[in-house]
Amino acid sequence: MSFEELRVIIVVYSSALIPLIYLLYSYKKLPPWVPLIYITAFIACALGWEVWFTYGLVDGDAVDLRRSAVLSSWIPLHLNWFLNSLADAGTVTLGGFWLMWRMCSKDNQIFSSWSWKAFGVFYIWCICQNIFVELFLYHDQLADGKLLSWAPLAPLGSYLNPELFSFNGGSVMLQTQIPWIILPAVIYAAVIKYSNSQLIKST
């Protein structure tokens, strides 16, 4: 096992499990929308692209064909989409909302009415983390020439997938960025809707 493979394994498992453990431990202290949004984001990411990319369901290669045997043994095929979706829901989504809250002076009002500043923070976080993942974590299995499946939240598939830019030998492709271009606004709107529905119930 190389150091890079070890790094990928540690990051994948920690980004998937640490937020889940924290959520299970602290859910009574958190706003009621947090667990619901976590589950909603998990389902959206799993069905939106993670399952499709993992198994190569439509004109794509399964993840085992796009990475080393070591990674496939430590992150099995049938666990890959699950771990990635946990990380999407926890580290990316809930982590992004925590960062958004901190950057907006801990103003809880951003979760009950739309704030462009708050959304901007959340959107930039989602895009930047995805670029980081593509360049430094999954750069080998997402590299140019590795075919990813069409997916509902990556509707252009590999059919229209230009390279957006490259850095340090890694490439950022359009197909892998589209899900996090689409999803942040939907998730933020869902938080506001659910938060307001809870306020109505409590009055």
List where the protein language model places each region.
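Aromatic-rich, lipid-facing transmembrane alpha helices and their immediate juxtamembrane interface loops
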Residues: 1-203
